């Protein structure tokens, strides 16, 4: 049997901090579907930002250029690529793969949250607009 992965070790070390986040008072303030919609309409940008930070780390810690050459610390490369794999292409219920961001956006649609702002933001990025 294979040993515990670096990602699993990281998750275990972060378990107490994750518990603090999950128990944050903001979640207790979400009492209605409308509360959830409003929360998600803002929180979706944090989900997007996390993915952007993750991809920046991947770019800085690994080689994403052509031609490829080994770059960075081996364990760091493995850890960041494991996280990217899970965040960018997690297994979807019923088969297939989906990013956590896309999953969150789909949940927003399902609960009736307004996705127009995040969709406009993404479209502006696709067109190359600077967000500064």
Positions of the model-derived regions?
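Non-heme di-metal
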Residues: 2-132
